[in-house]
Amino acid sequence: MVDMSTIVSDASQEGEIECDHDLHAFLCGLEADSSLLHPERLRERLIALDDLDAGFGGFDSEDSTRSMDSRKIHERAKALGTQLEAANAELYQSVRADIVRGAQLHTFLKRIQASVTQDRLVRPLPGFGFDFRDELVSGVLQLREPSEPNLQRSPEMVPYQPTPVRHILQLIAATALGADDVFVDLGSGLGHVPLLVSMVTEAQSLGIEVQAAYVASARECAQSLRLSRLRFIPQDAREADLSSGTVFYLYSPFNGSILTDVLSALRMESTRRPIKICSLGPCTRTVASETWLKASALPDMGRITVFDTQ
């Protein structure tokens, strides 16, 4: 009589051997590429880490049912992942040190734009997904995120999502932010946009955010990086003093009557001086319907749209 358990066991072992062979070849390729540890290869490291997680994630190296060779391969993968993560951490700390020393205008912008083609800098991919530049900025800012259940919000306030870095860079380029500008982020959340604007331009930045816990985190970050050209205020955007702003940004932080009231306040500001309003997300449709504003390009909720006063 044929022992089916033996057949199943043998088939399982053969499958494991074949799988281990493929993973071994893949791992050898990564281990042989010493350039992965170079600071500017962040994007490639992040891809490699994702691939390692896909191939080896969830593996228990103490699993006695695995062969010794299989466990050794997975231990190598774990060690390589640790090495790549350490290279990322070293890069983040290096950029933080550059910013603290005041070298941010050149070094930081150069690093986050590395390996990005010129057309993607001018007109980045639409949508709200993230890429390696967001990983870099997140690693550099090291923002402390408050626990969501402790936050209270109005039904007209949209849950916080950070603006993808590629769109922030597009905003900076499209508005040509300079030393005479005051950039105001209405509903700034953890402060990603004002922080980045302060790092790579000479403009003053102001983040207005109703959630005090978010403001506290943004202030901590600005202080740790010694950024002096920005402020964060815990305040409802409807009650904020907007008199100093020249460029205003809305990443659909609220809708309904709140958005209507804020746009009315901005219209009053536009009677006193020329201003620009930049939008991203669903609120773009509402902003585009304001007759006192003119879009610089066809409004697109998936990209930054810049509006000038008419």
Predicted regions span which residues?
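S-adenosyl-L-methionine
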Residues: 2-178
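Conserved class I S-adenosyl-L-methionine
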Residues: 180-189
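Conserved SAM-binding loop of SAM-dependent methyltransferases across substrates and taxa
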Residues: 192-201
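Conserved SAM-binding motif I beta-strand of class I
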Residues: 204-209
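Conserved SAM-binding loop
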Residues: 218-219
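Conserved SAM-binding strand-loop segment of SAM-dependent methyltransferases
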Residues: 227-236
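A short SAM/SAH-binding and catalytic strip from SAM-dependent methyltransferases
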Residues: 245-258
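C-terminal substrate-binding/active-site "lid" region of AdoMet-derived donor-dependent transferases
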Residues: 257-310
